[in-house]
Each structure stands twice: as structure tokens, then as C-alpha cells.
């Protein structure tokens, strides 16, 4: 009887020991909480900045919405060429009303010749006299080395149509055949350049 009691006591001790080991093993194998890297927040691109360069219109330039169509201009150049303003539509045109004997016209001519060479690939130029003869016109053209055509309006109709009471008068016609700028009197050096730069670009 004593041996049977001892047997059960040993068996119970073994069972308790096994249960304790199992508990230790279970708690020892518990997984550590997973550590996940925080997802990066959405990156915001820096705002795009747009820089607008506003070119200020030169003094006297007519706003595009208020420009009037230029009168017709059909004249014969001193070299025999027929000049028709309508054929030049699509390009800006400078029309200079002058006389070869006019002191103010002669004073502005060097500056006018210079700007005409600067813009010769972008802008057409023509000079229109009122009463110069062919020989006078050609002499004036050679004297100032003018490469653009000069013509004579002996009838005075062109000057009248353009409202030119005296010389010199310079008119800039835009690509659509409208009057963009007009100056009555002698041009100063550099005065016409910003006008043409604006008309060509806008």
C-alpha cells in the first residue's frame, strides 16, 4: 500500500514538472511584437513659379484693339519698282514721309537708315517724297546709303490719304495692316527701335 502511494506521488510530481516546463517553453517562444517602419508621408513638390515679363508699350503706341487700317499706298520708286503696301501684309512696315531738301528729314536720316538695317529681315521700309524728282531722290538715296526703296507721290494723293501736312512723318504699320504708331517730326536716334521691337514680338 505504501509502495502504491509512493508511485502515485512520483507520477503526480512528474506531471506537474512537465506542465511547468511546457508553460516556460510557451512563454519563452512568444513572438516579440513586430516593428514596422513608418511609411513616409506624401512628399509635396515645391510650387512651380512662373515669371512673367511684361514689356511696357513704347510711348505713342496704339493699343492693338484700337488700331485703324492703314490707307492704301501704291507708288513708283525712284528705281522703277512698283510699291504696294497691300503686298507687304504679314510684315510690319515703316513709312517715312520726307523731302530730300528738308533739313529735319536730313537730320533724322542717318538714324532711320541705321534702324532699317537692324530690322531689315523683319520689317519693311519705304520713304515717300512729295515733290522730289527722280534724280533728286536717287542722289539723296546714295548720299545717305539708303537700301530701302524711296518713291515720289507727285500727285499728293498718298500724303493726303495718310493725313500728312508736312514732313517728316513716320508711321509704323503692323502685320495686319493697321497703324500702330505715328510720329510727326524728326526722329531722335534710338526712338524707333523700341517701337519696332514691340511690334515685331507682340
Residue ranges and their predicted role:
Residues 1-9:
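Bacterial N-terminal signal peptides that target proteins for export
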Residues 16-20:
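C-terminal motif of bacterial Sec signal peptides marking the signal peptidase cleavage site
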Residues 21-25, 103:
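Bacterial signal peptide processing site
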Residues 33-54:
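Extracellular mucin-like PTS domains
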Residues 50-85:
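N-terminal "domain-start" segment that seeds a small globular fold
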Residues 83-106:
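Short active-site neighborhood of thiol/selenol oxidoreductases, capturing the structured segment around
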Residues 106-144, 154-160:
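Structural microenvironment flanking redox-active thiols in thiol-disulfide oxidoreductases
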Residues 139-146, 154-201:
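Thiol/disulfide oxidoreductase modules built on the thioredoxin-like
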